[in-house]
From Swiss-Prot:
Binds 1 [4Fe-4S] cluster. NCBIfam families: ispG_gcpE (TIGR00612), PRK00366.1 (NF001540). The lineage of its organism: Bacteria, Bacillati, Bacillota, Bacilli, Bacillales. This is 4-hydroxy-3-methylbut-2-en-1-yl diphosphate synthase (flavodoxin). It comes from the Bacteria. Its cofactor is [4Fe-4S] cluster. Disulfide bonds: none annotated. Its EC number is 1.17.7.3. The gene is ispG. It catalyses: (2E)-4-hydroxy-3-methylbut-2-enyl diphosphate + oxidized [flavodoxin] + H2O + 2 H(+) = 2-C-methyl-D-erythritol 2,4-cyclic diphosphate + reduced [flavodoxin]. It comes from Bacillus velezensis (strain DSM 23117 / BGSC 10A6 / LMG 26770 / FZB42) (Bacillus amyloliquefaciens subsp. plantarum).
Length: 375
């Protein structure tokens, strides 16, 4: 089973039923590609994202039609809704009134102080946080004039400026992002931000590219940041179906042991010893475990001689040979199974492990409730 890597502790901030920061796990976020005023299409996409493992979803709110749709969207989805606002404070007020769980603004772009005060007052009344979104591509003119071009120091200065506006209004339910398309700049900005303030950080490499190139670029940048214990939520930004963003995010978090609700596949790269169709089997198993909400490590290996030993860390796995497969747990062979049924046998064992995990969680939940009642 996976173990959660140590996180840099930050101030906890509530987003709907979730708590971002503190000692909580990194939360996966994505953004819809639909026109927000098209409620039916937007809800359908959000529900697809939630099924894939998305935990928070953001929608664009460029106009009043989009703002008016927030309430209808909110009623039909099961995950927290973030509304993206640029410049028009009235749209922020409508989004908050419509049930947004978080809004993303830059207070300095909203206009006069009374406009910012109105947004902060509404957010306070509803108990929702504000995300300050700093982007290297849209830094304030004064910052660019001071530094000459986008720098990590300039990005942090911008963040601190917007944070101060909110803090001066006694508002502290803040989440901050420091996005850049340049990987090295993003890494430096997030490192410096993590030392400059204790608000939770939303991670992202912006404009990262298409499915393949963007996955590599995001994994390189966000992987480096996560490895330093920095980050509380993240989005993989891709020019692709947003469901792919969620899939990549889950895999990235699993790589660092940061996902306690996802199964992981281990499979060998294939060689001349293989006597089964390992690639298609691995793909089938990967698809099967994509919906398993338990931290199980599953191995699919092509060599019965070295397979079990090579996957000692796996909770369950198969190693194929001519006409049969070896089913094993923690590197120990459990039994031999015919080749034609070995994938189905593996799936049954995966289901058993998942059920054991779910039962354990329910028992822990029941125990916690009993202790709460006693207190």
């Amino acid at each position: 089973m996976s173990e959660i890597t140590h996180r840099t502790k930050t101030r906890p901030v509530k987003v709907g039923p979730l708590t971002i920061g503190g000692n909580n796990e990194v939360v996966i976020q994505s953004m819809t590609t639909t026109k927000t005023h098209d409620v039916e299409a937007t809800v359908a996409e959000i529900n697809r994202l939630a099924e894939a493992g998305c935990q928070i979803v953001r929608v664009a709110c460029p106009d009043e039609r989009a703002a008016n749709a927030i309430a209808d969207i909110k009623k039909q989805i099961s995950i927290p809704l973030v509304v993206d606002i640029h410049f028009d404070y009235k749209l922020a007020l409508k989004a908050i009134e419509g049930g947004a769980d978080k809004i993303r603004i830059n207070p300095g772009n909203i206009g006069r102080r009374e406009k910012v005060e109105a947004v902060v007052k509404a957010a306070k009344e509803k108990g929702i946080p504000i995300r300050i979104g700093v982007n290297a591509g849209s830094l304030e003119k004064r910052i660019l004039e001071k530094y000459g071009y986008p720098t990590a120091d300039g990005m942090v200065e911008s963040a601190l400026h917007h944070i101060k506006i909110l803090e001066d209004l006694d508002f502290h339910d803040i989440i901050v992002s420091m996005k850049a398309s340049d990987v090295n700049l993003a890494i430096e900005a997030y490192e410096k931000a993590s030392k400059a303030f204790d608000y939770p950080l939303h991670l992202g490499i912006t404009e990262s590219g298409t499915l393949f190139a963007g996955t590599v670029k995001s994994a390189a940048g966000l992987g480096a940041i996560l490895s330093k214990g920095i980050g509380n939520t993240l989005r993989i930004s891709l020019s692709a179906d947003p469901v792919e963003e969620v899939k990549v995010a889950r895999e990235l978090l699993k790589s660092f042991g940061l996902a306690s609700n996802a199964a992981t596949l281990i499979s060998c790269p294939t060689c001349g010893r293989i006597e089964i169709d390992l690639i298609s089997i691995a793909n089938e198993v990967e698809e099967y475990i994509s919906k398993v909400k338990a931290p199980i490590k599953v191995a699919v290996l092509g060599c019965a001689v070295n397979g079990p030993g090579e996957a000692r860390e796996a909770d369950i796995g198969i190693a194929g040979a001519r006409g049969e497969g070896l089913l094993f747990r923690k590197g120990q062979i459990v039994r031999k199974v015919p080749e034609e049924t070995m994938v189905e046998e593996l799936k049954k064992e995966i289901d058993k492990l998942a059920e054991e995990h779910y039962a354990k969680l329910e028992a822990e939940k029941a125990k916690a409730e009993q202790e709460t009642q006693k207190a």
